[in-house]
Amino acid sequence: EQYLTELDAFCKEQERVQREKQKEFKANNPELFCRYPKFSKALAKVLDPSDEIKPAATKEQIGNQESKLDFTFPSQVREFFLLTAGIQVSTGVILTLSGMFDLTIHGEKYCVLGEFWKEADGDQLLLRTGEESVWYYAHEQDKVKRLCNDLIELLEKKLANYLNQR
């Protein structure tokens, strides 16, 4: 009986901490909620105390990363990083400016935008030069598939739906 009382108290405290984190996320990121409402609402529901939402990147930081990678980001990707330098969610969504790198798969050059564990841990979201499209690399199958037309579709449809199912 004592155990159940303690477990109940622990669960209530965890819920309280999660609600606080969600409130804080919404208060600290009004532009994110305005620009990507479905994604932001879904993200707020699954936020865990260990998850991280970074503050906005500067144009200079974005430009430096583009230079380092020798890759021009699509306009929607630049806009996203001007709202947050990155999001790391334990349920399998990682999009960080500093974590981007280039990768060649089957002779094709890509820029890795982040991770999306749709099929397996470590599957990657990719960009190609001169395209708004977001590609998905399922590393266990060693296949690259076109996932979305652009970043807004990725955030507002694919990732929002994925997070809502968690």
Regions found by a protein language model. Give the residues of each.
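A surface-exposed partner-binding patch
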Residues: 1-131, 166
